Amino acid sequence: SAAQKFRQTLLDDDEKVVFYRSINLIRAPYPTKYGLLNAHKVKSPFMHILNRLFVVQFKVNSQVKTLLFSPSDFEANVETPFFKRLTTKYGALSPLVNSFLAPVENTVEQAVAKCGIAPEDVDYISYDHLHTQDVRKWLGDAKTPGYFPNAKLLVMKQEWDSTTSLLPQQRDWYCPDGIKGIAEDRVILLEHSV
């Protein structure tokens, strides 16, 4: 498949990359009107986005570093106002409906274990954006240690700054307090692509 060829290209062409794997986490519902805008004729109000964890191990000065890209804590992410409304609107039937709307394939913890990686061996986590993300489980906060005790968050400075001062229309898509209490030394702010 194309994915297998891409994986092999990463491993063959770049001697720094020593391991790469993607693992399905959860199929999350997303409004079709936002996902496809006007490019659809489907009457379905939702489309599914497959959240995957990408595990990359690479060498830096002959040391292997581990990066987890998109480690979604979907148990905490349901506090995002949009998803909170969606997951509670069916009352007593909500658990059944939620298992249909957002089927879970793996947790991040299961995915990392499948790769044979210990939590303390994770050096970095990162996301394409922080909306809908609660990263406290992974990095810890003032009250609770993180699941990945040595990991640092790689994030664009502009994204981090935006998350700390959301506009009213953005709040529906950001997890309340998703970055609250994270120690500054656990965050690496990036000014540009690396």
Describe every region a protein language model picked out.
Residues 68-71, 123-129, 154-156, 190:
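Active-site neighborhood of phospho(di)ester-bond hydrolases with catalytic His/Asp-centered motifs
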Residues 79-82, 137-139, 165-167:
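Short, solvent-exposed loop/turn and secondary-structure capping segments
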Residues 88-152:
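Active-site metal-binding motif and surrounding structural segment of the metallo-beta-lactamase
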Residues 16-19, 66-67, 123-124, 152, ...:
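Beta-sheet entry/capping signal
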Residues 49-52, 149, 183:
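Residues that flank catalytic or metal-binding motifs in active/ligand-binding sites
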Residues 74, 131, 159:
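Catalytic metal-binding/acid-base residues of hydrolase active sites
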Residues 1-109, 111-117, 152-194:
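Metallo-beta-lactamase
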